[in-house]
Amino acid sequence: YGDHRDLHSFSTRRSSDLGRDGSDNGGYLRAAACAKHFAVHSGPEALRHSFDAQADPKDMEETYLPAFEACVKEAKVEAVMGAYNRTNGEVCCASPSLQKILRAKWGFEGHFVSDCWAIRDFHENHKITATPEESVKLALENGCDINCGCTYQKILDAVKLGMIDEAWINESCVRLFTTRYLLGLFDDEKTPYDAIPFTEVECEKNLELAHRAAREGIVLLKNDGVLP
């Protein structure tokens, strides 16, 4: 939806029936919806693993943050994924500024996940750390609960080196296991969604609904001489 904040907010709010309210599902999540990529993740594509996006406070508040705010406050998404790039000098997957907005300002209670291999980018592409252990420290210290990639395999090494406060690990574990409990993964198939048979997957009525959604979601703009 480009940079149109209203379209962004409208589309992301549609995930509200997956959120934490639990009003008609016994308190269980149907799925753990994730909002991504936080934040100012708009390219350039070829440079996204090392790019530093500069956005002033006005642009952040009016353009880049409203959709995420709607996801957190209205849709109550369970997860937020950090972007590959830096925003105003801070890597998005370990940004104190973005975490302050997300948790302190908006009240986000779910877990934060890195984009795939984004934490490896800290030392390989952004060059803001020198080693995987330093990257792990930076990410955990700044609220990245789970790493899509393999860099968190260095957590134990970082602990042995005295680089990591184990309280950071405990905090992340609480968030991650909270999501699993909300999904009913420890409740022995007692959630309302366990009764849905596998035959519902790609059944005719669902395929038709997906086709209808795609067909009716297309917008064709008429050229009234604006373009050559």
Language model: regions and residue ranges:
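Glycoside hydrolase catalytic-domain context in secreted enzymes
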Residues: 11-228
